[in-house]
Amino acid sequence: MSEIFDAKAFLKTVTSQPGVYRMYDAGGTVIYVGKAKDLKKRLSSYFRSNLASRKTEALVAQIQHIDVTVTHTETEALLLEHNYIKLYQPRYNVLLRDDKSYPFIFLSGDTHPRLAMHRGAKHAKGEYFGPFPNGYAVRETLALLQKIFPIRQCENSVYRNRSRPCLQYQIGRCLGPCVAGLVSEEEYAQQVEYVRLFLSGKDDQVLTQLIARMEKASQDLAFEEAARIRDQIQAVRRVTEKQFVSNAGDDLDVIGVAFDAGMACVHVLFIRQGKVLGSRSYFPKVPGGTELGEVVETFVGQFYLQGSQMRTLPGEILLDFNLSDKTLLADSLSELAGRSIHVQTKPRGDRARYLKLARTNAATALITKLSQQSTITQRLTALAAVLKLPAIKRMECFDISHTMGEQTVASCVVFDANGPLRAEYRRYNIAGITPGDDYAAMNQVLRRRYGKAIEESKIPDVILIDGGKGQLAQAKAVFAELDVPWDKHRPLLLGVAKGADRKAGLEILFFEPEGEGFSLPPDSPALHVIQHIRDESHDHAIGGHRKKRAKVKNTSTLETIEGVGPKRRQMLLKYMGGLQGLRNASVEEIAKVPGISQGLAEKIFWSLKH
């Protein structure tokens, strides 16, 4: 227990009402957030002589201050707790690493509705189907729908400005509502209705309606139409036969858990309208000494009560663990959703099968993750031994990419004890240097990255400079001149140059820009982690450079036209669907773009043609 914090005096001031408490360390950092039905009773439990776990002992030893927020109800306390956890990311709380909103398929409310992927708040008028586990699942479904039900997926800006149908119409993947006369309003509306029914899990209704239309077309001797509908029926049947279908109308999330070697995996199976839309594994950050019950309870609360998750609640949640606050969670979710949400922990029949499947997937994903972590841990340990460091908790690597000196981009990738930290990868656009001067580019990116205050936990143990002696000399010069509040001598600067014939395994490493470097055996685990982070940095730089080059390619032609500034360039490209669409447009079509006069449209047309 802290010598400064007076627990007895503090507890005398605490109420017995429900609420949330925040614990701070000597640096004023929130280290733990908790909720309680009775704040006095809960907080008193931290200062007993016999504490429940080593984790609690370590937590209490660091407490310097506690803030309390009283709430009207337990539900308010539960919501506030998870908002604080998301805000402060306390080190002693179980943390959900990925709380991005899930993607949906969006069917717009336009005159000619379009299909698209959507994330975030649902402001646009239309219908939302999902959620799907990731963007790939949505894109795959959209591609499938486009083959079966050819309704448009183009942006409204493209749709409104077309005078002739696009390639999607030519290959039979869109009915072409953008051009009058290509499809009747009734036919387009019918295909939209099929999509609506299909995404709602009502495949039988789609097939029934299609079969009726096919039979009518045959009776009317419209054999080509009947054959087209027959092909559509076969496509729908092929899709529905492949789907794992549960009881009709099931709308639930199934959550399985695995826990081993201090790591937890929570696997979520998404079932909507009786169909398994997909699944996803999560690996929450678990402080040492945490019990499985706390992992599950905190994960479920953060998963559903933080951010946009509360807008995607299913009717039922199946859990692989009996929560102590199950009733409170169900009541809170029901209150948020405005409808009844059931939380079930001991299902039977098909639901028990779902839970077993989720549990098996969690165990499999955890085994894979532990294996990967073991490998990266071994490699980092080997590298620490080579570099004579006690441990490597964080590494950063830099690379430069450009084309003939143009569109220079620097990348920074970050590894921790578990491998790549992709959320912390960064790209830097380099400007104000002589084209092709990689040394100046490295100098600039290092000053931008490290010439400011950095949190203690974000200071790297090793900074890897891809490029050899010259680049390492730049790094040394930058760090010698840094005037920063953090310990600039802590990171070890390591240069890496490609060896003979630029082959992997022949890399030369440098501690100093002068003198000879040294090599590691091709099968060295230390070399493997260096190759891994260097390749990640190279790929990240190349990716950023390609995006920048593509952007310049799309705008450079327009930049030479007098009267077309950045805003007009952006508007032209947006409304025409890119530079190619603009090249193919007529003067009249260009003049329809907001802010473009007839005279300017003619100038743009002739500039692009000649």
UniProtKB/Swiss-Prot annotation:
Keyword terms: Cytoplasm, DNA damage, DNA excision, DNA repair, Excision nuclease, SOS response
GO MF annotations, alphabetized: DNA binding; excinuclease ABC activity
Intracellular or extracellular location(s): Cytoplasm
Gene Ontology annotations of biological process type: nucleotide-excision repair; SOS response
Stretches assigned to the GIY-YIG domain: 16-94
Domain UVR: 204-239
Gene Ontology cellular-component terms listed: cytoplasm; excinuclease repair complex
Domain of life: Bacteria
Matching SMART domains: GIYc, HhH1
Oligomer and partners: Interacts with UvrB in an incision complex.
Functional note: The UvrABC repair system catalyzes the recognition and processing of DNA lesions. UvrC both incises the 5' and 3' sides of the lesion. The N-terminal half is responsible for the 3' incision and the C-terminal half is responsible for the 5' incision.
PANTHER family: UVRABC SYSTEM PROTEIN C, UVRC/OXIDOREDUCTASE
Similarity-based family: Belongs to the UvrC family.
Protein name as catalogued: UvrABC system protein C
